[in-house]
Each structure stands twice: as structure tokens, then as C-alpha cells.
């Protein structure tokens, strides 16, 4: 493969909100997660002879930090996005399945670093036989979230170490649709 060199600086605005959630499944198992969105990123990435420049007006990182003791079997969906739209930094965070039935969610939208929590579950609908087909992500009871996610890349990682088995599908793509804020914006 080609040589990869990266020198990136991730800026973390001190006034930005973060999403922090503890999900207690029972007395023995829990998960804490912290999500920091739309972190302006600058620098360069070089792959072989190609050089890519990142500027903080168009390039963002996300910090996803978690700790906990998970149940033996778990399934979850996570979707996120960071971008600039109409001059504002917009971040999306949606989680599903792993929080179902707990009364808590990791669903939120960030606008210029200010988080608006979405307290309702979202439903991820997709073809488990073809993760590259478009997905829908919708709020369970309202019209707050109504998105289509269209993947253009899939990374698959499978592990079978007898006691531990996992299958991860990471898809990268584009969102299209609507997320309605409480203030109707």
C-alpha cells in the first residue's frame, strides 16, 4: 500500500456542549458515552504523492468516548454527522437498539456547539443483507427525525475468538432529510 502521513489539529471550543449519557441495563451492566461533535480540524493528510488539506471551516472531527460493562450480547446502531450548513456548524448524533427500553437516548442535534437533546427513540431501518442500500432513520413517535442515509463505503470487521465474537459494519455516506428542533427551526 501507499504511505500515509497525517498531521491534524483538532480544536475543541471550550463553550461547546457535549452529549453525555449513562445507560444502566441492570445492576451489573452499564455504558457511559460522551460525544463531542463538530470539532474544527486543520492540517494535512498525505497518501503516496497526493496531499489533502483540511481547514476548520469545512473539516470536522468527533470524539466518541465510552466506558462500561456491556451485556454478553448486544446490538446497536450509531449514526453521526458534522458539517457546515448555511454558515453554521451542524452535528447529528443518533443511537438505536442499545438504549431501547431504558427511557434514555443518545439522540441530539448540535448547532454552533449548542446541543438540543432528542428524548425520543429513533428507528434505524436497513437491509442486513446489503448495508450499502439506503437506510432510513426516523423518530419513533413524532416527525422530529426523518432522514435517509445513503452509504458510499462499507468497512466490515469480523472477529471469532470462540468466547468473543463480533461483526461490525461501518458505513460512510450522506444524510438527506429533516431534523426538527423544538423551536421549529
Language-model segment annotations:
Residues 1-185:
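Structured soluble/peripheral alpha/beta segments that form catalytic or ligand/cofactor-binding pockets
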Amino acid at each position: 500500500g501507499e504511505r500515509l502521513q497525517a498531521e491534524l489539529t483538532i480544536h475543541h471550543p471550550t463553550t461547546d456542549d457535549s452529549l453525555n449519557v449513562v445507560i444502566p441495563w441492570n445492576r451489573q451492566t452499564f455504558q457511559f458515552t460522551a460525544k463531542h461533535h463538530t470539532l474544527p480540524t486543520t492540517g494535512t493528510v498525505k497518501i503516496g504523492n497526493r496531499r489533502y488539506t483540511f481547514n476548520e471551516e469545512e473539516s470536522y472531527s468527533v470524539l466518541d468516548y465510552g466506558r462500561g460493562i456491556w451485556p454478553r450480547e448486544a446490538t446497536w446502531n450509531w449514526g453521526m454527522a458534522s458539517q457546515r450548513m448555511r454558515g453554521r456548524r451542524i452535528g447529528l448524533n443518533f443511537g438505536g437498539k442499545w438504549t431501547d427500553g431504558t427511557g434514555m437516548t443518545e439522540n441530539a442535534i448540535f448547532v454552533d456547539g449548542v446541543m438540543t437533546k432528542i428524548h425520543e427513540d429513533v428507528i434505524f431501518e436497513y437491509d442486513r443483507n446489503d448495508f450499502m442500500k439506503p437506510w432510513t432513520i426516523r423518530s419513533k413517535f413524532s416527525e422530529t427525525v426523518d432522514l435517509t442515509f445513503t452509504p458510499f463505503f462499507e468497512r466490515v470487521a469480523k472477529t471469532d475468538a470462540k468466547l468473543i465474537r463480533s461483526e461490525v459494519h461501518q458505513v460512510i455516506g450522506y444524510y438527506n432529510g429533516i431534523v426538527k428542533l423544538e423551536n421549529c427551526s
